C-alpha cells in the first residue's frame, strides 16, 4: 500500500478486484488478522497491485472470496448446506494465511446446530448497457429473486402488485421483473423495496458482488448480486 493511502481511516471503504469480482469492505476488516497475507498487504508490509480502475487486485478465486471476506467480518465460518468446494476453500485459506479460518475448515464439528438449516435468497440485477452512447444508456434491466422459500416468493407476488406489468417470469423458485430504458427509476425503487422486504422476513445480507461481462460488440452487461441468509429450524415430517 502506498504511503499516501495511510490518510484513509480504517473504516473507509476499500474495493478489491478478486479474480474479476469486486468486493467492498474496510481496512479494519482486511487487517483483522495482522499475521495473515491480507493483514500484511493492507498493513503496509506487502506489495499491492491495482487494476486499471484503481481497485486493489488479487489474482485468486473471485466467488470463493465471499466466504473469506465474511469470515473476516464475523470471525465465523458460515457456508451453504450444499457447499461442496471445501478443498478449494482450504487452498484459498492457505493462500491468505488466515489461521483461524484454516482451523475452522479442518474442524469436523458441524457449522450449524443439527436441528437448523440455512435458507438463502439471491437477488440479482442484470443491466445491459450500450457501449457507444454518451452518456451510457441502459438498454434493459432484469431483477431476479431466486429462493426455495416459497412463502417469500408468494409475498413478493402479493405485495408488489404495483410492478405487476414488469413481472415477466415466475417459476417454482424464481420471480423476475424486466424494465426497459425508460423505467430506470422504477427498477431502483423496486430493488430498494425488495431489499427492505427480504430483511424484514429475518434475512441478513451475507454478500454483495459485481460482475462485468461483454457479450456483444455493442453491449456491456453489469450484474449485481446480493445474497441474503437466515437460519430456520427443521420440522418433523
UniProtKB/Swiss-Prot annotation:
Sequence segments annotated as region (Interaction with USP21): 113-187
Subcellular compartments: Cytoplasm, Myofibril, Sarcomere, M line
UniProt GO BP: negative regulation of smoothened signaling pathway; protein homooligomerization; protein ubiquitination; ubiquitin-dependent protein catabolic process
Any one cellular-component term (Gene Ontology): M band
Organism superkingdom: Eukaryota
Tissue expression summary: Highly expressed in cerebellum and brain. Expression is down-regulated in medulloblastoma.
Pfam families found in the cross-reference section: BTB_2
Interaction with CUL3: region residues: 10-110
Domain BTB: 12-81
The entry's keywords: Cytoplasm, Growth regulation, Tumor suppressor, Ubl conjugation pathway
GO molecular function terms listed in the Swiss-Prot or TrEMBL record: ankyrin binding; cullin family protein binding; identical protein binding
Keyword Cytoplasm recorded: yes
Pathway: Protein modification; protein ubiquitination
Region described as Interaction with ANK1 isoform Mu17: 1-104
Chain's role: Probable substrate-specific adapter of a BCR (BTB-CUL3-RBX1) E3 ubiquitin-protein ligase complex mediating the ubiquitination and subsequent proteasomal degradation of target proteins. Promotes the ubiquitination of HDAC1; the function seems to depend on KCTD11:KCTD6 oligomerization. Can function as antagonist of the Hedgehog pathway by affecting the nuclear transfer of transcription factor GLI1; the function probably occurs via HDAC1 down-regulation, keeping GLI1 acetylated and inactive. Inhibits cell growth and tumorigenicity of medulloblastoma (MDB).
PANTHER family noted in UniProt: BTB_POZ DOMAIN-CONTAINING PROTEIN KCTD6, POTASSIUM CHANNEL TETRAMERIZATION DOMAIN-CONTAINING
Subunit organization: Homopentamer. Interacts with KCTD11; KCTD6 and KCTD11 may associate in pentameric assemblies. Interacts (via BTB domain) with CUL3; initially a 4:4 stoichiometry has been reported, however, electron microscopy revealed pentameric states with a five-pointed pinwheel shape. The interaction with CUL3 is indicative for a participation in a BCR (BTB-CUL3-RBX1) E3 ubiquitin-protein ligase complex. Interacts with HDAC1; probably indirect as the interaction is requires the presence of KCTD11. Interacts with USP21 (preferentially catalytic inactive form).
Name the UniProt record assigns to this protein: BTB/POZ domain-containing protein KCTD6
Species the sequence originates in: Homo sapiens (Human)
Amino acid at each position: 500500500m502506498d504511503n499516501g493511502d495511510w490518510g484513509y481511516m480504517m473504516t473507509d471503504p476499500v474495493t478489491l478486484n478478486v479474480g474479476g469480482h469486486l468486493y467492498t469492505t474496510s481496512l479494519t476488516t482486511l487487517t483483522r488478522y495482522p499475521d495473515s497475507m491480507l493483514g500484511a498487504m493492507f498493513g503496509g508490509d506487502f506489495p499491492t497491485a491495482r487494476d486499471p480502475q484503481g481497485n486493489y487486485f488479487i489474482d485468486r478465486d473471485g466467488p470463493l472470496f465471499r466466504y473469506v471476506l465474511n469470515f473476516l467480518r464475523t470471525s465465523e465460518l458460515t457456508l451453504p448446506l450444499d457447499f461442496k468446494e471445501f478443498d478449494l476453500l482450504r487452498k484459498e485459506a492457505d493462500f491468505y494465511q488466515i489461521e483461524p479460518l484454516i482451523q475452522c475448515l479442518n474442524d469436523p464439528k458441524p457449522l450449524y446446530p443439527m436441528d437448523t438449516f440455512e435458507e438463502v435468497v439471491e437477488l440479482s440485477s442484470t443491466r445491459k448497457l450500450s457501449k457507444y452512447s454518451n452518456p451510457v444508456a441502459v438498454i434493459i434491466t432484469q431483477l431476479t429473486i431466486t429462493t426455495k422459500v416459497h412463502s417469500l416468493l408468494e409475498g413478493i407476488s402479493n405485495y408488489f402488485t404495483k410492478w405487476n406489468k414488469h413481472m415477466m417470469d415466475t417459476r417454482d423458485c424464481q420471480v423476475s421483473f424486466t424494465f426497459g430504458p425508460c423505467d430506470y427509476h422504477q427498477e431502483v425503487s423496486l430493488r430498494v423495496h425488495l431489499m427492505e422486504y427480504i430483511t424484514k422476513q429475518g434475512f441478513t445480507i451475507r454478500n454483495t458482488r459485481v460482475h462485468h461481462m461483454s457479450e456483444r460488440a455493442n453491449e456491456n452487461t453489469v450484474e449485481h448480486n446480493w445474497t441474503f441468509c437466515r437460519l430456520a429450524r427443521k420440522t418433523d415430517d
